């Protein structure tokens, strides 16, 4: 693959030296480089192949980094990273010590705002625009947001706020990759986009409105005529109701349309909205045909594409959940499955196919998902909300106010609890234990393996109140998983290994690492199963029988399961040395999950090492 032009681009300043014809050649080189890089490291592919021309046009037209570009979600920012001096870093994308797969302020001055969760870009760009206005700085502020992210309420809250904020420069670019451009939206629409984004059109429209303000009936007629005229070639003018000048849709892969339209919009003050249509996987036929498969692939050969992988010997926790959900739905027709736009990731594909009337993908709307579940529970349904731990943070008020306060029967299946590997700190589920166990009525369960996951899912589902089950990303330890729907006593743990002077209390899958460590130091290991209600009787029994306790969890130490054990001991007046092992008070960067855990001392060797360092005298 030739990269003659790309080799010359060390920053956007170099990009702006190219003519339009060279820009098109560069787009081909950049797209090929993205494909080659991601095939070697893994990462997000389809979305990045779809934003090549848009990334080029934005950096070509706007004076970055002086002008601010905020990429919503951010997994489509690889072309942006390559164009802003991080081409070499793509060799270690999302690897420990390498560059992030998302925009990150500490990584580059061109990353104006860190993103990874959805629908934040317009709010952030609006805040920047107001700050620039207040400081008397002239700059442009651009929020690039996808059609999926635009479905979330936060995006509309931001536009509503922008509509009443005077004297700011804000451009929202809607990257719509969920529709195709029909034939009428070709050359004609390119011309109309350039016309509507031009200064003459904007000035004429403003003058006309000023005059017509004095003739209200004529003003209303003019409004309707304008809407009908625009309706011939564009979507409804919803965004203009928020105060934005709407332009588009235009072909997001046509630089001859993108560049002049963006140049026109740059010259206009106020609120501008550009609707561009792109195609996920653009330029790579396999990704165009199946953008979901190529959304976030691992390493693969671009010449042959992603090959059908052999079924892993060990099931993932997501698969265990998906099978349990279908089995429970067979038995209980009240069960309803809910996901906020994470059907594949949360394991609901089979459930949707088998129970379509009881499956609800509510879109990127975590707040709505939780309260929707609360409404279902009020009427006797049994909702199960399948959600990543990190995304439940976005629905926390609803969990407290709408579910727990009313003690409603809602089960939360929390995938990606703990470290998540390549996606890094933005997607890590480190905080759910701390923010859930403090909520009255809430049950918090943490299974140690695949079999326990099925047992605890059934137990929490049968519990008449709010309950959560947290489990990590990836494969389990290979434990056999039964087909039944048995339950276990609520709030009761069990002893996995007897030992001598030290007792290790494990919460979640780190029980396996604890067992490995215990074998080297003859320690006792308890699988606590529940953080809340905590097995108080077992904790006090172990404290009475041992000289020291160790708590182990793949979650934040502050406020976590270890804190619950300390609170129990303090309440009972028991004084005993306790070592808490878990995730530190820090954001953990991307990298291999196992390597990250080992680096934090949360593998078997690390746990043994920590216990020897703290309680060596007890092991002598």
Swiss-Prot record:
GO terms for biological process: 1-deoxy-D-xylulose 5-phosphate biosynthetic process; isopentenyl diphosphate biosynthetic process, methylerythritol 4-phosphate pathway; terpenoid biosynthetic process; thiamine biosynthetic process. Signal peptide: none annotated. Keywords: Isoprene biosynthesis, Magnesium, Metal-binding, Thiamine biosynthesis, Thiamine pyrophosphate, Transferase. It comes from the Bacteria. Its EC number is 2.2.1.7. The keyword Metal-binding applies. Its cofactor is Mg(2+); thiamine diphosphate. Mg(2+) binds at residues 147, 177. InterPro entries: Dxylulose-5-P_synthase, THDP-binding, Transketo_C/PFOR_II, Transketolase-like_Pyr-bd, Transketolase_BS, Transketolase_C, Transketolase_CS. The keyword Transmembrane helix does not apply. Homodimer. Catalyzes the acyloin condensation reaction between C atoms 2 and 3 of pyruvate and glyceraldehyde 3-phosphate to yield 1-deoxy-D-xylulose-5-phosphate (DXP). This is 1-deoxy-D-xylulose-5-phosphate synthase. It comes from Bordetella pertussis (strain Tohama I / ATCC BAA-589 / NCTC 13251). The gene is dxs.
